[in-house]
């Protein structure tokens, strides 16, 4: 579309990690939607006082070590501010493991705005974007850590509310200033295309948008969005889902194969939406690991005939093409 910001990758593009920018070509095998810690208490009570950092690090390290056995080098941590984002923990985990971790800026409006801070209601989209841009330019609080993407969320059961239009507008304005890709907790087709429309109205190309939880959308919707350039994030690979049920591993293999057959494998991102340390539970509660893609989904895709090159596309090429800085 004429006038839209170009988001085609160029040589030596960079990706912002918790330790600073790295060449996109060096990020390697990447899990694009995971969580280290999530705190569902709500924005009015959220804060670092809710957890002990070293306990979180101790809990999470073995799960990162496990995926390093599968040569995973990068993990995109999708927990937003006011939901348990902790850049200090992510930086320490990166230091302990040598992995690239990527955090985010943005606000999460899903669940009826429970995780949006009080100041949001009295601020314009431009003013909200200035907060997010400041995190990118100067770091998150005093951590020195800069976000590598914009993470927002909208409710998927209805048309976008005015609050959620403000969130996606703020994301568009932030993208224009920073070049960060926008990943939005979305789900079904309708909110996905409504958000794409808002982005286009602000001259943001659809290829700068990740449709998070796109498995909740229709195949037709996934194909239509991919044709526009949108990234299709199939991101809840979960071995705890009973075989034969919707969204089991076979379902994911089928959806990925269908997108391949439609010509859009190069727009697919895969992950687990797994983890995570829960501050309200003893020892952080039950932690779901990050290895199911390697133990179950990749073998299922290989059975469907996906080649080594196509697996490489899903695990390495697509993530770096999605998360590079567009500036």
Predicted features along the sequence, with ranges:
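Catalytic pocket-lining loop regions of alpha/beta-barrel enzymes
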Residues: 176-260, 268
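Mid-to-C-terminal alpha-helical segments outside catalytic/metal-binding sites
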Residues: 4, 11-20, 291-327
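Active-site gating/metal-coordination segments in enzymes
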Residues: 92-95, 100-102, 106-178, 231, ...
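Acidic/histidine-rich helix-loop elements
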Residues: 36-55, 114-121, 158, 241-244, ...
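Divalent metal-coordination and catalytic microenvironments
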Residues: 33, 75, 175, 232, ...
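Short acidic/histidine-rich active-site segments
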Residues: 183, 235, 264-287
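Alpha-helical scaffold segments that flank or form the walls of functional sites
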Residues: 28-32, 37, 45-100, 126-145
């Amino acid at each position: 579309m004429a006038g839209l910001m170009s988001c085609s990758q160029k040589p030596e593009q960079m990706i912002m990690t918790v330790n600073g920018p790295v060449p996109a070509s060096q990020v390697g095998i990447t899990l694009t939607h995971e969580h280290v810690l999530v705190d569902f208490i709500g924005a009015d009570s959220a804060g670092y006082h809710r957890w002990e950092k070293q306990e979180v690090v101790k809990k999470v390290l073995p799960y990162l070590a496990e995926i390093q056995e599968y040569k995973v080098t990068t993990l995109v941590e999708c927990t937003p501010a006011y939901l348990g984002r902790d850049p200090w923990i992510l930086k320490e985990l990166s230091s302990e493991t040598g992995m690239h971790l990527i955090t985010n800026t943005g606000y999460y409006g899903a669940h009826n705005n429970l995780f949006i801070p009080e100041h949001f209601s009295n601020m314009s989209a431009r003013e909200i974007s200035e907060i997010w841009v400041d995190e990118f330019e100067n770091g998150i609080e005093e951590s020195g850590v800069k976000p590598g993407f914009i993470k927002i969320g909208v409710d998927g059961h209805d048309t976008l509310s005015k609050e959620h239009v403000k969130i996606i507008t703020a994301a568009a304005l932030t993208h224009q200033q920073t070049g960060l890709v926008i990943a939005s907790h979305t789900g079904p087709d309708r909110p996905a295309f409504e958000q794409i429309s808002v982005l286009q109205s602000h001259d943001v190309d659809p290829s700068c948008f990740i449709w998070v939880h796109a498995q909740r959308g229709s195949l037709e919707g996934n194909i239509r969005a991919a044709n526009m350039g949108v990234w299709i994030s199939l991101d809840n690979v979960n071995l705890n889902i009973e075989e034969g049920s919707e969204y089991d591993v076979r379902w994911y293999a089928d959806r990925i194969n269908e997108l391949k057959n439609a010509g859009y494998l190069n727009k697919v991102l895969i992950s687990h939406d797994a983890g995570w340390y829960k501050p309200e539970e003893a020892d952080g509660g039950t932690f779901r690991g990050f290895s199911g893609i390697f133990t179950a989904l990749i073998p299922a895709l290989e059975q469907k005939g996906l080649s080594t090159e196509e697996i490489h596309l899903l695990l390495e090429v697509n993530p770096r093409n999605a998360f590079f800085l567009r500036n």
